[in-house]
Amino acid sequence: MGFITKALPLALAAFSTVNGAKILEASPGADTIPDSYIVVMKAGVTSETFSAHTDWVGRTYQRRPMRRGANSQPMAGLQHSLSFGGNFMYAGQFDQAMIDDIAKNDDVDFIEPDYKVTLSSITEQKDVPSWGLSRLSTKEPGGTTYFYDESAGEGTTAYIVDTGIDVNNGDFGGRAKWGNNFVDHQDTDCNGHGTHVAGTVGGKNFGVAKKTNLIAVKVLDCNGSGSNSGVIKGMEWVMRDASGGGNSTSKASKSVMNMSLGGPRSEATNRAAKAISDAGIFLAVAAGNDNADSQHDSPASEPSVCTVAASAEDDTKASFSNWGQAVDVFAPGMHITSDKPGNGTAVLSGTSMASPHVCGIGAYLIGLGKKGGPGLCDTIKDMARPVIKNPGQGTTNKLIYNGSGK
């Protein structure tokens, strides 16, 4: 029923230490990737220190006898080095002895298991008119018209971290471009989720910000599967691209990012999300589809992002939507019509569909001259209306509104 990119259940509450950094442990039954870890360095570690550390990891791994993982294949060792505005981390495959040695390093903050990220089932319903655009631009439910300023997010850039985008879809009018791919060698959306999300953010027919530029950042494959470390790698690329390689903040302040994905709470993911917000990029994320407290999910639990729950047509919380104090705002998430690859349409439900409404409003407001970055979420909350019935324990009752006056 619900539709969101999500990881299978995983808890990182427990941890062990080896005379140094915390080694976070997955709960029993968690869908971790065997022998795969994300290592996060302490705040204040310099690029020189990080480089020396990863060089040490590489040399130490090479000196040891070849290790084979659970699938009998040789372990890869260090795979990705990641940098977020002075925050460093890396991912790789290591045996327990190597992880224990890494944890003893004074510059390491914590280590957590890498885990699988997948899509839940897709909900499709034919011939249902979309209602989300009308709802976010009118004060009462039941409308059929979308009211918006003709600026429509012009001059902004929306990064869609997902399954990719069908950039040739006619609804995007040439405004969709391919950014990067961190999961496979197919630079296309062979799943459909990312194209649907992009259509809600900035499609000509279904989009909130109809003139924003859309950038595809693929972190999930055709089956909707990927890894947490791959998602973080995609996040790093967005931050670098939006900040012009670190030399400019002007593009970042006019950039928005959508993550209709998530999983169990991950300190590495939350730290990466905070770095993106700190760089001046507005980040909208899905609250989750488990009808549970979103404080247990990432990146939804990161305070600096704009966490979005899903509402139904009658202004109630969608039955599947997560709730809790981490939720910033509600947006339409039931039976949302948008694009699919090949110029068709699909009707999907989930907080995956709610989040791009907020990402689109972010681009729309920046186009109107509002200040971008994480403070934009406060602007959106201030404009939202307290109309959601039964939002959930400790949860805001505010539904997004674009300020049309209608």
From Swiss-Prot:
Keyword presence, Ribosomal protein: no
Signal sequence region: 1-20
Keywords: Glycoprotein, Hydrolase, Protease, Secreted, Serine protease, Signal, Virulence, Zymogen
Short name of one Pfam family: Peptidase_S8
Glycosylation, residue list: N223, N247, N258, N343, N402
GO MF: serine-type endopeptidase activity
Major localization class: secreted
Glycoprotein in keyword set: yes
PROSITE patterns in the cross-refs: SUBTILASE (PS51892), SUBTILASE_ASP (PS00136), SUBTILASE_HIS (PS00137), SUBTILASE_SER (PS00138)
CDD domains cross-referenced by the UniProt entry: Peptidases_S8_PCSK9_ProteinaseK_like (cd04077)
BP GO annotations: proteolysis
Name this protein carries in UniProt: Subtilisin-like protease 6
GO cellular-component term (any): extracellular region
Subcellular location: Secreted
Domain Peptidase S8: residue ranges: 130-406
Role according to the record: Secreted subtilisin-like serine protease with keratinolytic activity that contributes to pathogenicity.
InterPro entries on file: PCSK9_ProteinaseK-like, Peptidase_S8/S53_dom, Peptidase_S8/S53_dom_sf, Peptidase_S8_Asp-AS, Peptidase_S8_His-AS, Peptidase_S8_Ser-AS, Peptidase_S8_subtilisin-like, Peptidase_S8_subtilisin-rel
Propeptide segment residues: 21-122
Active site: D162, H193, S352
